[in-house]
A protein has these predicted regions:
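Local beta-strand/beta-hairpin segments that build beta-sheet-rich folds
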Residues: 1-6
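Charge-dense, helix-prone N-terminal extensions
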Residues: 7-13
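A short, structured beta-strand/loop element
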Residues: 15-51
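C-terminal structural segments of small proteins and small subunits
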Residues: 55-84
Length: 84
């Protein structure tokens, strides 16, 4: 699964295989925790990311949601700037 961003120990990835991976989403991994977030409404689909890490992921998503949606639609992965 390609890593598209890394910040504060949080790994953001994106992977899809046609309709098998809908709805559009990204997994976020922090240590042994993982959550999946919708690119449609930025709501957590599932997972157990700690609250502090989840807030950072959502803040980052707000800044880059258009890029994330474009990447999902085009299936063209690139690195996105980390949260600073």
């Amino acid at each position: 699964m390609p890593t598209i961003a890394l910040f504060y120990g949080i790994i953001i990835q994106m992977y899809f295989l046609s309709s098998e991976h809908n709805p559009p989403h990204i997994p976020a991994i922090y240590n042994d925790h993982k959550s999946t977030y919708s690119l449609i409404d930025m709501i957590k689909i599932n997972g157990d990311l700690p609250i502090k890490a989840e807030k950072l992921v959502l803040e980052w998503m707000k800044l880059h949601i258009d890029e994330l949606r474009e990447m999902w639609d085009s299936q063209s992965f690139k690195r996105i700037e980390p949260l600073e």
